[in-house]
C-alpha cells in the first residue's frame, strides 16, 4: 500500500486552501478554497484526520480525507482554537472584554464536544490572557489541566464540572504535561521571590502532597522565565532559564542557562563551551540525545547525551535553530530571521553532512511527516515582502516554489500531522534527487570597498576563526595501561625528546640543495621591526614542525595545537611576503 500524501494548509490574506504534498504540489481536488480575507486561525488535529479554521464569520471543521464539512460554529470573534489529542474536545478562545459600565465580561474560553454527533458546549471559562490559554491534555485524554490563579487544576475523563485534583505551590507560573501513556507526569515552574530561588519540580499525577512527593527538583537564581521541554519517553525535561537583563553586560537580550532534570531525581546544568545566548534546544525522537544551538555569532551547535556529555560538535556557523526529522535520523541546523537562511542537513547516525541549501529571507521551517521533505516560508508579519514558501528534498533539491501575488500576504503554512509509524525511516541518500527548479540563490551584493582598495587583492583577514565539526566521543577504547607500561612509555618519550633537542642543536649543513633545513639562514633586512617579525614567524613554524612530528608519531594533540598546525600556510605566506620585500 502506497504511503499517504500529506496535505499542506496555506493561510493568508487571500483566504485558506489545502495543497497536496509531494510529489503533486497541486490544490486539493476535494477542498473548496475559502476566499475570506479574514481567516484568523487554522489547525489540524494531532492525528491529522480533521482540519478546522475560522474565517471571521464561522468556524468550519472538515474531514481531511474527503473535505466533508462536519461541523459549523457561529463564532466570528475566535482568534485561537485547539483540538484535544483524540479529537473529543474543541477549545476556542476570543479576546476577553468587559461591559461599558465595568461589569465582568462573559466567559471567552469555550469547550465543545465533537463526539456526540451534534456539537455542544460542555464548559465555559474566563481566560483573560492569551498566553497559555489552551487546556493541556494527556495523550489518552484521561487528564486535562489548566493554570488558574497560580495553581494547576486537573480534570479527569473530560468532566469539567468537577476538579479532580489541584497542584498548589507558592505561585505556579507555568506547567507542562508529559507526552505518552500513563502514568502522566507534570513539570511545574515557580519563579523566585524575596531572595528565594526559582525552581522546577516534577510530579507524577496525582501524587502532589507530602514531603517526598516530587520526583525531582531543580532550583536556580537566574530565571525570570523558563521554557520546559519533555522528551518523547517522558523520562527527562530540558529547562531553558532566561533573565531579562544580563548583569554582566555581555548581551542586550538577557542571560540563558540550560538545565537537565530526570524523573529519577538526577539533575545537572548543561555546560556550554561558548558564551552567549541559547537560541534553540530540541530533543531527538529517540529521547536519548538533544541538540543545543548557542553562543555569540557564529553560533556553535552540539549534541549531548543523557549524561549531558557532548557527543558531537558541529563547529561554528551562522545558525540559530535546530530541527530533527520526525524519525530522528536527520538533523537540520539553520539560520533564519536576521540570518541569511543557510541550512546544514546532517546524517545523525554517521554525523556526515548531506547538503547545504539556502532559503533566503525564510522565517519558518517545518519537516514533512514523511521525513524526506521540508518547507521553508517567508511569512507576514515577520516579513511583509517576498512572501511565499518552498518545498525541498533533504538532499538540497528545490522541488516546488510558490510566491504569493503582489499586495498579498502569507500568514501561515502547516503540514498535516500523522501518527507515529505511518512513515518509517528510510535509508539516507547523499546524491541530490532530480528537480525542475534551480536551487542556486542569487549572490548577495559585495561589500563596499573604498576606491583606493578596489584594484588591490582582497585581504584574507577574518574577525573570527570558524571551528570545524568534530566528534566529542573518546577516541580510544583501549584498556588503561599498567603502571609499568606507563613508566616505560614516559621513558621512551623523554628519550625521544632529548634526541630531537640534540638534533636541533647540531649546525646546519651547507648543502644548497637542502631547501627544508630546520635552521634557515637568518635574513638581515636592515629594518629591526621586519627582522623581529621574520624571527617570530620562523619560531612559530619551527614549533608547528615539532607538533606535526608528534602528530605523525600517533600522539593525540590538543585542540589549540591542531589549530596552530592549520595556520601553517598563513604563516608561510606572511614569511614569504616579508622576505620578498627585502
Curated annotation (Swiss-Prot):
Molecular function terms from GO: mRNA binding; ribosome binding; translation initiation factor activity; tRNA binding
SUPFAM superfamilies given in the database record: DPP6 N-terminal domain-like
Intervals holding WD repeats: 21-63, 73-124, 273-314, 358-402
Pfam families, sorted: eIF2A (PF08662)
Transmembrane segments: none
Listed InterPro entries: TIF2A, TIF_beta_prop-like, WD40/YVTN_repeat-like_dom_sf
GO biological process terms, semicolon-separated: regulation of translation
Record's keyword annotation contains Coiled coil: yes
GO CC list: cytosolic small ribosomal subunit
Gene3D superfamilies per record: YVTN repeat-like/Quinoprotein amine dehydrogenase (2.130.10.10)
Keywords tagged on the record: Coiled coil, Initiation factor, Protein biosynthesis, Repeat, Translation regulation, WD repeat
Coiled coil stretches, renumbered: 482-580
Listed Basic and acidic residues bias regions: 495-506
Spans annotated as Disordered: 436-533
Compositional bias of kind Polar residues: 510-522
Family note: Belongs to the WD repeat EIF2A family.
Function: Functions in the early steps of protein synthesis of a small number of specific mRNAs. Acts by directing the binding of methionyl-tRNAi to 40S ribosomal subunits. In contrast to the eIF-2 complex, it binds methionyl-tRNAi to 40S subunits in a codon-dependent manner, whereas the eIF-2 complex binds methionyl-tRNAi to 40S subunits in a GTP-dependent manner.
Protein name: Eukaryotic translation initiation factor 2A
Gene label: eif2a
Amino acid at each position: 500500500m502506497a504511503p499517504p500524501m500529506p496535505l499542506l494548509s496555506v493561510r493568508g490574506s487571500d483566504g485558506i486552501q489545502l495543497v497536496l504534498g509531494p510529489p503533486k504540489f497541486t490544490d486539493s481536488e476535494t477542498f473548496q478554497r475559502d476566499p475570506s480575507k479574514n481567516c484568523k486561525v487554522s489547525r489540524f488535529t494531532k492525528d491529522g484526520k480533521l482540519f478546522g479554521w475560522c474565517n471571521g464569520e464561522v468556524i468550519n471543521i472538515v474531514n481531511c480525507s474527503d473535505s466533508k464539512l462536519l461541523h459549523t460554529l457561529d463564532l466570528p470573534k475566535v482568534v485561537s482554537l485547539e483540538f484535544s489529542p483524540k479529537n473529543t474536545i474543541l477549545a476556542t478562545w476570543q479576546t476577553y472584554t468587559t461591559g461599558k459600565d465595568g461589569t465582568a465580561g462573559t466567559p471567552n474560553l469555550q469547550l465543545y464536544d465533537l463526539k456526540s454527533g451534534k456539537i455542544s458546549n460542555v464548559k465555559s471559562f474566563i481566560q483573560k490572557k492569551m498566553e497559555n490559554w489552551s487546556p493541556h491534555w494527556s495523550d489518552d485524554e484521561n487528564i486535562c489541566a489548566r493554570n488558574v490563579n497560580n495553581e494547576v487544576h486537573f480534570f479527569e475523563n473530560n468532566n469539567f464540572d468537577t476538579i479532580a485534583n489541584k497542584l498548589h505551590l507558592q505561585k505556579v507560573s507555568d506547567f507542562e504535561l508529559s507526552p505518552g501513556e500513563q502514568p502522566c507526569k507534570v513539570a511545574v515552574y515557580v519563579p523566585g521571590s524575596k531572595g528565594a530561588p526559582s525552581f522546577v519540580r516534577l510530579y507524577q499525577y496525582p501524587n502532589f502532597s507530602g514531603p517526598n512527593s516530587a520526583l525531582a527538583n531543580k532550583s536556580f537564581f537566574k530565571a525570570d522565565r523558563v521554557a520546559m521541554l519533555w522528551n518523547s519517553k517522558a523520562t527527562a525535561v530540558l529547562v531553558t532559564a532566561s533573565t531579562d537583563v544580563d548583569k554582566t553586560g555581555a548581551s542586550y537580550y538577557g542571560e540563558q542557562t540550560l538545565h537537565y532534570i530526570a524523573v529519577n531525581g538526577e539533575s545537572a546544568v548543561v555546560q556550554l563551551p561558548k558564551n552567549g545566548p541559547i537560541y534553540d534546544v530540541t530533543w531527538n525522537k529517540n529521547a536519548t540525545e538533544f541538540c543545543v544551538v548557542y553562543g555569540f555569532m557564529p553560533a556553535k551547535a552540539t549534541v549531548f547525551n543523557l549524561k549531558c556529555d557532548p557527543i558531537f560538535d558541529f563547529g561554528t556557523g551562522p545558525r540559530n535553530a535546530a530541527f530533527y526529522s520526525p524519525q530522528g535520523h536527520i538533523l537540520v541546523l539553520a539560520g533564519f530571521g536576521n540570518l541569511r537562511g543557510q541550512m546544514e542537513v546532517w546524517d545523525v547516525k554517521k554525523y556526515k553532512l548531506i547538503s547545504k541549501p539556502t532559503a533566503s529571507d525564510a522565517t519558518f521551517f517545518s519537516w514533512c511527516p514523511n521525513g524526506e521533505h521540508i518547507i521553508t516560508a517567508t511569512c507576514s508579519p515577520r516579513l511583509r515582502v517576498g512572501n511565499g514558501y518552498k518545498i525541498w528534498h533533504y538532499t538540497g533539491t528545490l522541488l516546488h516554489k510558490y510566491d504569493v501575488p503582489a499586495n498579498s500576504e502569507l500568514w501561515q503554512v502547516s503540514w498535516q500531522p500523522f501518527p507515529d509509524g505511518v512513515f518509517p525511516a528510510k535509508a539516507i541518500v547523499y546524491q541530490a534527487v532530480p528537480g525542475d527548479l534551480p536551487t542556486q540563490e542569487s549572490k548577495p551584493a559585495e561589500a563596499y570597498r573604498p576606491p583606493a582598495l578596489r584594484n588591490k587583492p582582497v585581504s584574507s583577514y577574518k574577525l573570527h576563526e570558524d571551528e570545524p565539526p568534530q566528534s566529542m566521543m573518546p577516541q580510544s577504547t583501549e584498556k588503561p595501561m599498567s603502571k609499568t607500561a606507563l613508566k616505560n612509555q614516559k621513558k621512551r618519550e623523554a628519550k625521544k625528546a632529548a634526541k630531537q633537542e640534540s638534533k636541533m642543536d647540531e649546525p646546519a649543513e651547507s648543502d644548497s640543495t637542502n631547501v627544508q633545513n630546520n635552521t634557515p639562514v637568518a635574513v638581515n633586512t636592515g629594518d629591526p621591526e621586519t627582522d623581529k617579525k621574520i624571527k617570530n614567524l620562523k619560531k612559530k613554524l619551527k614549533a608547528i614542525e615539532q607538533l606535526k612530528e608528534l602528530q605523525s608519531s600517533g600522539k593525540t594533540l590538543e585542540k589549540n595545537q591542531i589549530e596552530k598546525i592549520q595556520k601553517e600556510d598563513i604563516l608561510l605566506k606572511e614569511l614569504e611576503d616579508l622576505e620578498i620585500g627585502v
